[in-house]
Structures are given as structure tokens and as C-alpha cells.
Amino acid sequence: MQPTDWKPMQSVGAGVKEIRIRTGRKAYRTIYIANLPDAVYVLHVFQKTTQQTEQKDINLAKTRLARILRNR
């Protein structure tokens, strides 16, 4: 089952997705990967303050994904 408001985050890695949550004037994002056989991994959750996802948030998710894949 897919969330209703999401998009692929290929800039982070293959199979990574972003759930978009809006509450009033605030926006939140959850970056995760669910195509690994043992678990769903939440890579990063943050409040969005700009129109585009900031590079620091993408880099943090990439670093966490690399660590997960390296330790498998």
C-alpha cells in the first residue's frame, strides 16, 4: 500500500521515497526506503522551510542509506 502524497527520491538512492505531510501552513517530509527484505528504514524526518528540499537534508539521508547498505 502506498501513501497518498509521496514521490520517489532518486537523488538519495534507488527505491527511496518521500512522504509529504501538510498541516495548515507547515510542511513535513519523511524520507524512507521500504524495498529491503528485512525492514522499512526511515532515513530522515524534517520540517520543510523552503520550496525545494535542502541539500543538507538530501546528504543526511544519503549518508544514512549508505550506512544501512554497508552494514547489511
Task: Tell me what each language-model feature is.
Residues I31:
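Basic, low-complexity intrinsically disordered segments
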